[in-house]
Amino acid sequence: MDSPSPNSDPLTIGGRQFNSRLFTGTGKYPSMTSMQQSIERSGCDMVTVAVRRVQTVAAGHEGLMEAIDWQRIWMLPNTAGCTNAEEAVRVARLGRELAKLAGQEDNTFVKLEVIPDARHLLPDPIGTLNAAEQLVKEGFTVLPYINADPLLAKRLEEVGCATVMPLGSPIGSGQGLNNAANIGLIIENAGVPVVVDAGIGVPSEAAQALEMGADAVLVNSAIALAGDPAAMASAMSQAVMAGRTAHLSGRLPRRDQASASSPTTGLVQSPQ
């Protein structure tokens, strides 16, 4: 089997194709230049943007809309900062208008985040489901950020979400895939793409997610807070491609006992 290249193995979400299975963010970078270089080195073609921070011109987000080539990069507006379903729906609508200002008139994507707890940043399952139902009715392409809950993931798929985005571990924690077993169940049962979002700290964890069968990963903090963000972005890109190739290749089955690599017949016998 030939190794897939990004162009020969696209990911489709909401009818749109993406060549890269690594999505990135725009927060926490030391500078706008660092963000631009990291996006370029990552090879990604979808970047998430916090609508509220852009709307209020929060620190670190000045000039963000002008800093990214929106003819090449697909915008994924997100509802970060929303604590309930009603807020999230309102901010999603603003995000759609923001995408239009970037020249993406047909962009209906939204990364849905409903997070009432500012300390642990864990998503509210009930608020997320309620907001998702409303946004789907309004024609949005909904990518919901959720705990690694297989039942919730299936319910969100049933109401019309374009993906599910289970967390590996809490946002920005760098703890990796603490919920690997549940993520595996989500992948096994999903009829929509599964994008692992949050907690990935190093490229090996991004590769692990793709090896398991996840369709993509979204990585922000691990890149933005690295000693060399652009180099880390490149490493993440390579890891994602390696993980995807490994998944398609099929891993060696696990065994309870050793299995010799060399044949056991025709061995040279030592003289008696």
Curated annotation (Swiss-Prot):
<keyword id="KW-0704">Schiff base</keyword>
<dbReference type="GO" id="GO:0005737">
    <property type="term" value="C:cytoplasm"/>
</dbReference>
<protein>
    <recommendedName>
        <fullName>Thiazole synthase</fullName>
        <ecNumber>2.8.1.10</ecNumber>
    </recommendedName>
</protein>
<keyword id="KW-0963">Cytoplasm</keyword>
<dbReference type="InterPro" id="IPR033983">
    <property type="entry name" value="Thiazole_synthase_ThiG"/>
</dbReference>
<dbReference type="InterPro" id="IPR013785">
    <property type="entry name" value="Aldolase_TIM"/>
</dbReference>
<feature type="binding site">
    <location>
        <begin position="198"/>
        <end position="199"/>
    </location>
    <ligand>
        <name>1-deoxy-D-xylulose 5-phosphate</name>
    </ligand>
</feature>
<comment type="function">
    <text>Catalyzes the rearrangement of 1-deoxy-D-xylulose 5-phosphate (DXP) to produce the thiazole phosphate moiety of thiamine. Sulfur is provided by the thiocarboxylate moiety of the carrier protein ThiS. In vitro, sulfur can be provided by H(2)S.</text>
</comment>
<dbReference type="InterPro" id="IPR008867">
    <property type="entry name" value="ThiG"/>
</dbReference>
<feature type="active site" description="Schiff-base intermediate with DXP">
    <location>
        <position position="111"/>
    </location>
</feature>
<dbReference type="GO" id="GO:1990107">
    <property type="term" value="F:thiazole synthase activity"/>
</dbReference>
<comment type="subunit">
    <text>Homotetramer. Forms heterodimers with either ThiH or ThiS.</text>
</comment>
<keyword id="KW-0808">Transferase</keyword>
<keyword id="KW-0784">Thiamine biosynthesis</keyword>
<feature type="compositionally biased region" description="Polar residues">
    <location>
        <begin position="258"/>
        <end position="272"/>
    </location>
</feature>
<comment type="similarity">
    <text>Belongs to the ThiG family.</text>
</comment>
<feature type="binding site">
    <location>
        <position position="172"/>
    </location>
    <ligand>
        <name>1-deoxy-D-xylulose 5-phosphate</name>
    </ligand>
</feature>
<dbReference type="GO" id="GO:0009229">
    <property type="term" value="P:thiamine diphosphate biosynthetic process"/>
</dbReference>
<dbReference type="Pfam" id="PF05690">
    <property type="entry name" value="ThiG"/>
</dbReference>
<feature type="region of interest" description="Disordered">
    <location>
        <begin position="249"/>
        <end position="272"/>
    </location>
</feature>
<comment type="pathway">
    <text>Cofactor biosynthesis; thiamine diphosphate biosynthesis.</text>
</comment>
<feature type="binding site">
    <location>
        <begin position="220"/>
        <end position="221"/>
    </location>
    <ligand>
        <name>1-deoxy-D-xylulose 5-phosphate</name>
    </ligand>
</feature>
